[in-house]
Amino acid sequence: MEGFFFVRNQNIKFSDNVNYHYRFNINSCAKFLAFWDYFSGALVEHSHAEKCIHFYHENDLRDSCNTESMLDKLMLRFIFSSDQNVSNALAMIRMTESYHLVLYLLRTIEKEKEVRIKSLTEHYGVSEAYFRSLCRKALGAKVKEQLNTWRLVNGLLDVFLHNQTITSAAMNNGYASTSHFSNEIKTRLGFSARELSNITFLVKKINEKI
């Protein structure tokens, strides 16, 4: 299979022939790359890249028709590619405002337990309405909804990976109370904090036997 990747007019295209054509918004790629760089510790200075870049790709990615899954596969292959054209393309994505905005949000929620939109806006230096618009473009969702999701995920990771209690995880992630965290779990995931604790206990026991 022969494919090509290029960036132009805020979109990324990947195609192999006239029968297959995938189109991704560059902001989705920027979000993926920002997460990868942030959590892998790969944040570096990137040089200027051309606005239109292309390269040939030999691997067949047609095994999935899910656009989000396809984007993940492409980005991972691009990140680990040694092709200079690929590196230039990623450098261009790293120059976008969406990329830096996602990094800004990730850094802020790591430093502060409770993040307010007003505070984010003031530090970013734009109006609240414009900030919300930028976030919507970069995140693909409302900024408050996305921040709440990230906070919930961080809380769950504290419980599962760091063996914290529900109470400790709630306090460490800016929840007003344990019940607030518990209600969020129930609303978003469909099971209670007590059930979550039981799941954690069960997983630990299974791992001990293994």
Swiss-Prot record:
GO terms for molecular function: DNA-binding transcription factor activity; sequence-specific DNA binding. Residues 99-199 form the HTH araC/xylS-type domain. Pfam families: HTH_18. This is Transcriptional regulator MxiE. Necessary for the secretion of ipa invasins. Probable transcriptional regulatory protein. Keywords: DNA-binding, Plasmid, Transcription, Transcription regulation, Transport, Virulence. PROSITE patterns: HTH_ARAC_FAMILY_1, HTH_ARAC_FAMILY_2. It comes from the Bacteria. Residues 118-139, 166-189 bind DNA.
